């Protein structure tokens, strides 16, 4: 009687050998059967034999039927071998492609990159933010076009939502992303500058020469950049640094510089086209940097035809980057948030330059950062430019509140009850000057080493004061006409006269203060708005309202406007600079003013001296020398919060719409 292997102790020895060869923690590998019996032999349960060189077994050959082998295990082994061969070839192709890219970019060989052995490390399918989320403007995911139309929604291969997250009530969209992990819903992060951007920008393509680009950058750095709050908008010291940080910022700086230098029209056209192209291409991308926001602000401050749209786009990107939260983080001790909070204040002013002046509601409201600007000024890293910047923040807070109180409806006249609130805003602006003008004296000393700026910081505060008073008090004439307006009340007349004197003070400062005269070409277009707005208002008031209504010397108005035109014609700037268009437009307005003056048989410049003893108002208006209705210059768009946006549009070079 044969003994079983168990009785003979063979089974125990075999198990010992298996345990010694295979560690306990590793599973026993599966044994794949090599049986190749065909279906016919399996059905008859007979031995399936193959002769050498034959593809059918002997049973199937004798029966004359097709020999079919149903060995799924063997099929799995064969298919697995094919898949591995293909995967190996694909990996080799990827390695070759990566090695080529590394050589092209001057980076170390692929073999120098090691994979960590930590089981908790990131897998190749789930790269971390720093290694898998760097995209330049030209190489971002949004720039890659799909093969066909349709929405492509992808999911992040990241961890599941953390139920222990300390932020119990996050933003709704953040909660949606936390659950779905859809990339399209993710809050944007700040992207690191791409190290190879220098070799890919428009200067490397030879759009303009590097020497000319260096000249333009140097001009911008010592002029416009210093005028705009002491250079806080451009933190880079050389062109190479700007190019590595943002091609958009480089294009913006060179475009603005070329606009301000005579005989650079061809360069301006090239840089402007590149800038517009880059802005368009980045409008739907998700990868942005602080320098991209600065680039949009540079364009908004000096490119009048794009200013409104660029400022709005800059604010939207800034909120995606979380700049509106930087102030709170800074006061909690995160000093690295200073630059981001500073940029948020700059965006507030930029937004209000092109909203309040045009009678549009601003995008940025008065949040804690805006209201507590004095706390920001106490930070140790604050520079003199911050004081200049926050002076405008404080002023626009007052004007914004006035805008919300009185609105921008050009057909809504102020009631007598409104003048009480108007006086409150006048007092607030007076207090603003008392607070910030002494501070600006310190800024003048700080800017003494800049031959281009000189005393502009302190004089600029006074200029903004006069313009704010003019803009606010000009509301007293809104929706009024000399043909159907009764006698002015004392409050309305007082407010209108303040508007007139403030507008004349604006023009006088530009003409008489040497440092403002010298800087007028390089200041942001909001200052040009002040000048144009004031001149246009005075010309139209001189025609619509005679001296019996208001304290206005039309001869002095004509002289002031004529001198402003001469100043703008003499500035050194490119042919497409805004001052050229303003000068041409005001010249046409002055011609119309003189034509109307002469048509009434009165020498030019003496409008205010006639009919001074008449009683103004109502049907008696025509008897006092008022122009007939078809010659009355429309006052809409020349006061308060209703400036006509076409006023600064270079495409409207003849300014005929100003004299409809």
UniProtKB/Swiss-Prot annotation:
A GO term from the CC aspect: nucleus
Subcellular location: Nucleus
A single MF term (Gene Ontology): zinc ion binding
Keyword Transcription found: yes
Keywords for this protein: DNA-binding, Metal-binding, Nucleus, Transcription, Transcription regulation, Zinc
Gene Ontology biological process terms from the UniProt entry: DNA-templated transcription
Family matches, as InterPro entries: prtT, Transcription_factor_dom_fun, Zn2-C6_fun-type_DNA-bd_sf, Zn2Cys6_DnaBD
Biased composition (Polar residues): 130-141
DNA-binding segment(s): 38-67
Matches recorded under Pfam families: Fungal_trans, Zn_clus
Annotated PROSITE patterns: ZN2_CY6_FUNGAL_1, ZN2_CY6_FUNGAL_2
Bias (Basic and acidic residues): 13-28
Residues covered by region (Disordered): 1-28, 112-163
Domain of life: Eukaryota
Signal sequence residues: none
Record PANTHER family: FINGER DOMAIN PROTEIN, PUTATIVE-RELATED, ZN(II)2CYS6 TRANSCRIPTION FACTOR (EUROFUNG)
Family the entry assigns: Belongs to the prtT family.
Entry function: Transcription factor required for protein utilization and degradation. Regulates transcription of major secreted proteases.
Name of the protein: Transcriptional activator of proteases prtT
Species per Swiss-Prot/TrEMBL record: Emericella nidulans (strain FGSC A4 / ATCC 38163 / CBS 112.46 / NRRL 194 / M139)
